[in-house]
Amino acid sequence: MALTKLSLVLFLCFLGLYSETVKSQNCGCAPNLCCSQFGYCGSTDAYCGTGCRSGPCRSPGGTPSPPGGGSVGSIVTQAFFNGIINQAGGGCAGKNFYTRDSFINAANTFPNFANSVTRREIATMFAHFTHETGHFCYIEEINGASRDYCDENNRQYPCAPGKGYFGRGPIQLSWNYNYGACGQSLNLNLLGQPELVSSNPTVAFRTGLWFWMNSVRPVLNQGFGATIRAINGMECNGGNSGAVNARIRYYRDYCGQLGVDPGPNLSC
């Protein structure tokens, strides 16, 4: 009888441990757990190795999984991306340009980003992408071609004849010195061919990520307001309260969707 009771206790303990590891069939796992090829949540190689569907997947050797299987791919799901771009009108040029796959491909060319990004950072980034492009409607700045973004005093990245350096891509890369520095970093001739940003969606997202890593990520720990200032400081201090409030609304929305707290210091 005592042996039977002991067996029952051990069995119940096993069930408790099992339920702690396997949260639900077909996944919906916590952020730190992998969804296995069979649709269960866990953290061992059986879950995070071969066939891993989402979460912090890794190859059988213990390294991060290929594009789409790592943390950035598990956060920026197709459903999350579609929830944004589907709000753009049917006639928007960006609707047939920007894709979730092009973002993931671009992100994986920045391993320091792809392997360390958090849900709050994605909420921050896509709030700005949404605002800058109108839910991925616009590839280029409205009336941008009529505006002069050539700093003739910048001799390191001189303007090419007949080329315009107006806003393009998800972060609206602007000015010759930004096109020049970005192109140099990405090994692309963006100074001579700025139109590459508006003709190749992966290049477009790569330019956004370049600007992000150099100008925005360093201030993330200061709050969302600091990222607004990094992208368009003219909106701050009452410069354009409507734009600031719109960015904050998007940010709060995406934090809610991704299950993270927005944190303090949202405005600038």
UniProtKB/Swiss-Prot annotation:
Location of the active site: E132
Q: Which reaction does it catalyse?
A: Random endo-hydrolysis of N-acetyl-beta-D-glucosaminide (1->4)-beta-linkages in chitin and chitodextrins
| Compartments it resides in | Secreted, Extracellular space
Q: Which GO terms describe its biological process?
A: cell wall macromolecule catabolic process; chitin catabolic process; defense response; polysaccharide catabolic process
Chitin-binding type-1 domain location, by residue? 25-59
One annotated GO molecular function is: endochitinase activity
What top-tier enzyme class does this entry carry? hydrolase
Residues linked to a glycan: N265
Per the record, its GO cellular-component terms are:
extracellular region
Q: Where is this region: Catalytic?
A: 71-268
Q: Which SUPFAM superfamilies does this entry report, sorted A to Z?
A: Lysozyme-like, Plant lectins/antimicrobial peptides
Q: Which InterPro entries match?
A: Chitin-bd_1, Chitin-binding_1_CS, Endochitinase-like_sf, Glyco_hydro_19, Glyco_hydro_19_cat, Lysozyme-like_dom_sf
| Induction remarks | By infection with the fungal pathogen Phoma lingam.
Q: Tell me its family.
A: Belongs to the glycosyl hydrolase 19 family. Chitinase class I subfamily.
**Could you tell me what this protein is called?**
Basic endochitinase CHB4
Q: Which organism is it from?
A: Brassica napus
